[in-house]
Amino acid sequence: MGEIIKYKGFDHVWQYSGPWLYCLIGIYISLPVLAYHILPWIFHKNRSNKRKTISIFVLGDLGHSPRMCYHASSFSKLDYYVNLCGYVETEPSHQIVDDVNIDIIPIEAIKNTNNLPYIMFAILKVVRQCGKIWSILWDTRGSDYIMIQNPPSIPILLIVILFKTVFSRETKLIIDWHNLNYTILNLRYNNLNHPFVKLVKLYEKILGQFANLNITVTKSMKKYLVKEFGFQKSKIVTLYDRPGVQFQPLSNKREFMSEHKLFEDIDIEKYKVLISSTSFTPDEDFNILLDALKNYENTPNTPPILLIVTGKGPLKGKFLETVDKLEFTNKVCVKSAWLSSEDYPKVLACADLGISLHTSSSGIDLPMKIVDFFGCGVPVVSLDFPAIDELVKNKVNGLITNSKSDQTKEVARLVTEVFTDDALLRSIKEGALEESNSRWDENWMQTFSSIFENKS
């Protein structure tokens, strides 16, 4: 019978050990301390005895991201140092550029100049953005807060969570929910069960819960995040969009119109001015408005209309082609304009009526353009969708179409009704002027000053 195997313990292991074994044991024991204490201490910028800092990220053009710029300005007024990071395709307002507390950090806008397939370009764009965003996070490390907007949240939400977890654990994450990323992606696929759409929804649902604070633009969105995404209600605050100080009723309206090139070939005493602003994206169907104006053109006893459409985007060329094909008479004049941040609010204030064709990919966001119109005291006609009544009160500050009716006929009917009924126009104009009294600064301070008050 063979010799019985005897337990000898681990003493024999030390016969083959050396400094390398002690080194490995030391590294293993020190890893948690290194990851959770030493690295953050080394890489965290020393901001002791300094005022608080927030880094605001916008994966879009800063000049056309008013809500995020308003946030930056509001934090500045609380004496925060603000890193405002985003695309600089158009210059932000002077209020932002001239603010000594706000540092604008450009992010390169990556465009598909080589006409790559959508998936290939999307992957390339995400990879390049990851590098740039990480670089900015590194340079601005140690911020008290990081704020991002959603959408878009790919790839920035994941990058920020990883960065703050490893290198900036005291930094708090704020997500400003303008809409839902997956519903916008669904405009491309028109299938909520598409794998990409479901993946993006899961991305938002899981990673969004890492935020210390979620801000929503509507109460409907807050309810959605609680019910569908399982967010904690206590971590969600609704902050309605309100106009900035630059959006005001224009006292010298006729003088401005007589000097601006948009109105130079128009008899401003005869024409009613209709204005809509857009990004020319698929979630706004301008054929509804153009076909409605064709119907209006054939309606007797109605005043002539000047339609001004401001903005730019992928479908602008198609819009202009449609205008040419419709061959409007002098009764309907259509102009497209890309306005500076200084001219835009003044031109809006010249309108007799605003038009919003926004229908919302999610049904729970609201168009900023209507807020801008109200700031200038201009009533609106809006298409109907679930959350619109949180902003537009029918026959009080505007008119809302009947969603069960043909939308082209509805828009034509409402525009005709407003421009042939002076009493109705005066009434909704008064309602819009009443809305203009509610401003961003007061609303933001009332909601957030106690949360973000700089006590350092």
From Swiss-Prot:
Pathway entry: Protein modification; protein glycosylation
Lumenal domain ranges by topology: 1-22
Cytoplasmic side: 44-103, 125-456
Main localization, broad class: endoplasmic reticulum
Gene: ALG1
Entry's transmembrane regions: 23-43
Entry keyword annotation includes Nucleus: no
Bilayer topology term: Single-pass membrane protein
EC number(s) reported in the record: 2.4.1.142
Localization terms from the record: Endoplasmic reticulum membrane
Family (UniProt): Belongs to the glycosyltransferase group 1 family.
Protein name: Chitobiosyldiphosphodolichol beta-mannosyltransferase
Intramembrane ranges, chain numbering: 104-124
Keyword check for Protein transport: no
Swiss-Prot/TrEMBL catalytic activity: an N,N'-diacetylchitobiosyl-diphospho-di-trans,poly-cis-dolichol + GDP-alpha-D-mannose = a beta-D-Man-(1->4)-beta-D-GlcNAc-(1->4)-alpha-D-GlcNAc-diphospho-di-trans,poly-cis-dolichol + GDP + H(+)
Role noted for this protein: Participates in the formation of the lipid-linked precursor oligosaccharide for N-glycosylation. Involved in assembling the dolichol-pyrophosphate-GlcNAc(2)-Man(5) intermediate on the cytoplasmic surface of the ER.
Lineage, opening ranks: Eukaryota, Fungi, Dikarya, Ascomycota, Saccharomycotina
Pfam families: Glycos_transf_1
GO biological process, one term: dolichol-linked oligosaccharide biosynthetic process
Keywords: Endoplasmic reticulum, Glycosyltransferase, Membrane, Signal-anchor, Transferase, Transmembrane, Transmembrane helix
Enzyme class: transferase
A Gene Ontology cellular-component term: endoplasmic reticulum
InterPro entries given in the database record: ALG1-like, Glyco_trans_1
GO molecular function, a single term: mannosyltransferase activity
